[in-house]
């Protein structure tokens, strides 16, 4: 969200996006996360978007479920029957299609599911839908009394390099523009076998448009 802009833009980077690692070898974007310091992921974002990353925040599954439950659930439209069992990780996704309010565990299944033709690209769209619904729920005045509960979740499960002032500044800017001025999009690109290959020209145009506050 550039200074002076009335729009907050969230860009999703698909997990299978090709990016050069520290050794110059092209790898999946998600390989920069597991077992590596945040700097590796921040550098990966810079490589695929051209944007420097000043701060980072890591929200784990427990934090995600806690936030959703603290908000009383999240309203989404489940677009298809979703059923998946992972014996190794010991979790089950079991959702039926239609408009509904999901609790934390169900919402986590919704944003993790990718057993369909478009795989992670379809999952990204569901994650964006859920984020927008969460943003709308979060600004409900009734939740002002749950600030302490939210902060307990942050203290217990969220890892970041931000201070309290920066949290407050981001929150105030988000409240100022409101969720109706949030927009979500996926890193422009195309499938290249099992990978997502960023379209450098389209990415460049998108980033410049965001910086200038223009139409996308």
Task: List the predicted regions and their residue ranges.
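Non-catalytic, solvent-exposed segments at the cell envelope interface
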Residues: 1-216
């Amino acid at each position: 969200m550039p200074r002076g802009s009335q729009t907050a833009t969230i860009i999703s980077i698909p997990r299978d996006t090709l990016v050069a690692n520290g050794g110059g070898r092209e790898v999946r974007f998600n390989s920069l996360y597991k077992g590596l310091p945040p700097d590796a992921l921040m550098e990966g974002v810079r490589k695929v978007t051209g944007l420097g990353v000043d701060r980072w925040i890591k929200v784990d599954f427990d934090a995600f479920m806690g936030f959703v439950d603290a908000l009383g659930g999240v309203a989404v439209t489940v677009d298809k029957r979703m059923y998946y069992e992972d014996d190794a990780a010991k979790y089950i996704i079991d959702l039926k299609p239609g408009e509904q309010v999901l609790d934390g565990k169900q919402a986590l299944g919704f944003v993790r599911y990718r057993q369909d033709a478009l795989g992670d690209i379809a999952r990204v769209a569901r994650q964006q839908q859920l984020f927008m619904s969460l943003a709308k729920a979060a600004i409900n005045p009734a939740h002002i009394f749950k600030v302490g509960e939210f902060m307990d979740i942050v203290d217990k499960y969220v890892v970041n390099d931000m201070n309290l002032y920066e949290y407050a500044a981001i929150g105030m800017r988000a409240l100022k523009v409101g969720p109706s001025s949030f927009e979500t999009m996926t890193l422009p690109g195309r499938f290249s076998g099992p990978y997502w290959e960023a379209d450098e020209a389209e990415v460049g145009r998108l980033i410049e448009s965001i910086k200038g506050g223009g139409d996308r």
